Regions:
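Generic N-terminal targeting/processing segments that precede catalytic cores or assembly contacts
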Residues: 1-66, 250-251, 255, 262-267
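Short, ordered loop/turn segments at secondary-structure junctions
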Residues: 82, 96, 106, 198-200, ...
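A structural-propensity feature for long, helix-poor, extended segments
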Residues: 90-138, 294, 298-310, 322, ...
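Extracellular/luminal Protease-associated
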Residues: 191-270
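Conserved phosphate-handling catalytic cores of large alpha/beta enzymes
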Residues: 268-335
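Extended, low-charge hydrophobic alpha-helical regions
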Residues: 328-473
Length: 473
């Protein structure tokens, strides 16, 4: 057995999983019988994949074909990554050793990263961290998944996940599962500090005791209060260090929160365990007091917020969740409820100009979304199985298209056509004169955005716990 990218081989070799590949791509041979002229060539490609190549090599080749003949952007890698998600899920269901699954997953993600670097692509188009988190649903072992993620140092920063969360003090962003407030303005760099105590004027420690005694000497109505002196000291320190975000495990001072909201400084109180994990990952100290902060205690993150999905939740005093979906390119700012969001996704998926043909898979995806929302508007727990199934079906058809693309490239067809399989019984080719021809890039963008919205909604149940209903007296 050969090792995977230099790692020691563990009991199973990926090349032994040819039945898995065959199950994912067997439909391609039946579909391609529509054109007898190319059936034998495509069958040779499929059989060559099954006999000579591993899953990893097949995925890598698909990525290469996609980038060469389709796009040079991160969406190609994202598609291949999500496709691998379905393969990993099948591996786990077959009872394969989880260690092997994680090694294979890490190998594919690393290959995707290599391709991204080779084509000088930015990371915001591919949420590799979210991909690995999604794979954890299949592996059911976060420690193993973390090993796969840990090597991707350039793709595991705080900028990977952005979820807008409404709180009583100020809005906040979810960065990799950590709640951080924001005024909504975009900054090129985030400078974050972590505190393990309260952030208020009555937090008793050396340095603030003397201020209280001095304040009592001044004439009433003219003497600055203890909180004012403390606020002046803290704001001066924040300005000197150019702090943009504060994570604190204790209480928040309302005056400081107001000051931060007016000056575009993020501030939020969250769990101590969450801050400890973030502090450990970023290799910075958790400070007891803000005035003890130095430049080396600040986490600096470069933000590349382009075409992101943002989600706004308003749980306090309400019985529903509000979604805010924003994008620099395609989606303008809009504040809508979960039900309305699902309706919009479903409408987009049913648009014949975007999704010609039946669009069976996409329709099932939107119906699943609607069904889940009807069951529980607050979305405390989402089941990922159905969404994963439909996403895997789409990816399966997409990879079948890639195999045909490779055949066209081999036959020196310079006029490579846009195409995609809309269902398992028909083959759609581009018809420039038609108003509803199937443009693969548009279709891929539509379902990928719908799937990303679903993934964000799944993450909400983990990051945000809605307030419990009032107890009946």
């Amino acid at each position: 057995m050969t090792s995977i990218i230099g790692r020691p081989t563990i009991q199973h070799d990926i090349q032994n999983y040819t039945p898995l590949i065959e199950r994912h791509y067997a439909a391609g041979t039946r579909l391609l019988t529509i054109n007898n002229e190319i059936t034998s060539s495509i069958s040779d490609i499929l059989s060559g994949c099954l006999k000579k190549q591993s899953c990893i090599e097949l995925i890598e080749r698909a990525v290469n074909v996609q980038m060469k003949y389709r796009w040079s952007g991160g969406r190609s890698v994202a598609l291949m990554s999500v496709l691998w998600y379905g393969c990993v899920k099948d591996l786990v269901e077959q009872g394969i050793d989880q260690r092997v699954v994680v090694i294979v997953m890490q190998c594919v993600v690393e290959k995707c990263v290599e391709r991204m670097k080779e084509f000088k692509m930015s990371s915001q188009g591919v949420d590799l961290l979210s991909l690995c988190k999604g794979l954890a649903h299949g592996c059911k072992d976060w420690k193993l998944v973390y090993k796969a993620v840990s090597s991707l140092t350039s793709f595991t920063s705080l900028k990977q996940v952005s979820v807008l969360y409404e709180q009583s003090v100020v809005p906040s962003l979810v960065h990799a599962g950590v709640l951080v407030p924001s005024t909504g303005k975009v900054r090129e760099r985030e400078r974050i500090v972590i505190l393990c105590g309260d952030l208020c004027s009555d937090y008793n420690h050396t340095g603030y005791k003397g201020i209280l005694k001095e304040a009592q000497i001044f004439t009433p109505n003219l003497a600055p209060s203890t909180s004012q002196l403390w606020l002046n000291k803290i704001t001066t320190h924040l300005t000197s260090l150019s702090i943009t975000s504060i994570l604190v495990s204790g209480k928040l001072d309302p005056d400081l929160a107001h000051y931060c909201s007016q000056n575009n400084i993020n501030i939020i109180s969250t769990k101590y365990d969450t801050l400890a994990r973030l502090s450990d990952q970023c290799d910075v100290a958790m400070l007891p007091f803000l005035d003890a902060c130095t430049a080396r205690d600040v986490i600096e993150v470069k933000c590349e917020r382009v075409d992101e999905i943002w989600v706004s939740i308003s749980p306090q005093g309400s019985d529903h969740v509000t979604i805010l979906l924003r994008s620099c390119n395609k989606i303008k700012g809009s504040d809508i409820s979960v039900t309305s969001l699902v309706a919009r996704v479903q409408a987009a998926l049913q648009d014949q100009h975007v999704l010609p043909g039946r669009g069976v898979t996409e329709l099932k995806l939107s119906q699943t979304l609607s069904h889940e929302v009807d069951l529980d508007p607050l979305l405390p727990q989402w089941q990922v199985e159905d969404v994963t199934l439909y996403s895997a079906l789409i990816c399966q058809r997409f990879c079948q298209s890639l195999l045909r693309a490779e055949h066209l490239a081999r036959t020196n067809n310079e006029g490579l056509e846009e195409f995609n399989f809309d269902d398992l019984d028909s083959l759609s080719l581009e018809d420039v004169e038609s108003e509803v021809y199937d443009v693969l890039s548009i279709k891929e963008s539509s379902w990928l955005r719908a799937f990303e919205v679903t993934r964000v909604l799944l993450g909400i149940g983990l990051a945000v716990k809605p307030p419990p209903p009032p107890k009946e007296k």
